[in-house]
Amino acid sequence: MDAAEDPENIAKVRAVNAGGTRNIAQVCKKLDCKMMYISTDYVFNGQGTQPWQPDCKDYAPLNVYGQTKLEGELAVANTLEKYFIVRIAWVFGKNGSNFIKTMLNVGKKHDTVRVVSDQIGTPTYTLDLARLLVDMAESEKYGYYHATNEGGYISWYDFTCEIYKQAGYATRVVPVTTAEYGLSKAARPFNSRLDKSKLAENGFQPLPAWQDALQRYLKEIDF
């Protein structure tokens, strides 16, 4: 994310997120097949308190990552008719690094941690997401969707408190603002709330609550 802001990396990021996506969309058009594109809330400006609607076109990316993912979205939508553009946020899964693994490691080494409390969204568990994507791919209900876990909107502070509670950690969590925590290279959205009602409206099963997803996830990893 932050590395994408470095001038020497921008062309490469755009080549992957926009150019690569466009190439795949063009092949899908030739083969007359469906395309699934995973995108992000970063295509919006991250302001306000209202959940972003899947079909909202008020795009205003805050950073290079968001801008190039938006370019990828538009490449898909402008090339194909049979597509699913699925936006997710705060992703965690068994493989790779993620916020949960980071906070578990930090919690082992420190008695107190500072976590931002003014960025609001909902986590997405890749296992739950994958099941939804299979159902989508087997349908013809094309379009834009949002697909984070249910369970309500939370801050990174709230998420950390629940992580430590379920993991049995006694680490103290202190809420701070983004300004107090310190800025990163890539601007982060304050409002990552995604409205997911379109899933049920089209007959798809919403993802389970993030609290349940976290409980299942912690059983899958070593910490």
Model-based region annotation:
Residues 132, 139-184, 190-191, 210:
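Mid/C-terminal beta-alpha module of Rossmann-like enzyme folds, strongest
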Residues 21-24, 73, 133:
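Conserved internal alpha-helix within the Rossmann fold of NAD(P)-dependent oxidoreductases
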Residues 1-16:
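NAD(P)H-binding glycine-rich loop region in Rossmannoid oxidoreductase-like domains
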Residues 22-62:
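Conserved Rossmann-fold NAD(P)-dependent oxidoreductase catalytic core, especially the SDR/UDP-sugar
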Residues 190-223:
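C-terminal amphipathic/interface module of NAD(P)-dependent oxidoreductases
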Residues 29, 60-84:
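Active-site Tyr-X1-5-Lys
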Residues 74-121, 127-128, 135:
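NAD(P)-dependent short-chain dehydrogenase/reductase
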Residues 12-23, 67-68:
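Glycine-rich NAD(P)-binding loop of the Rossmann-fold in SDR/ketoreductase-type enzymes
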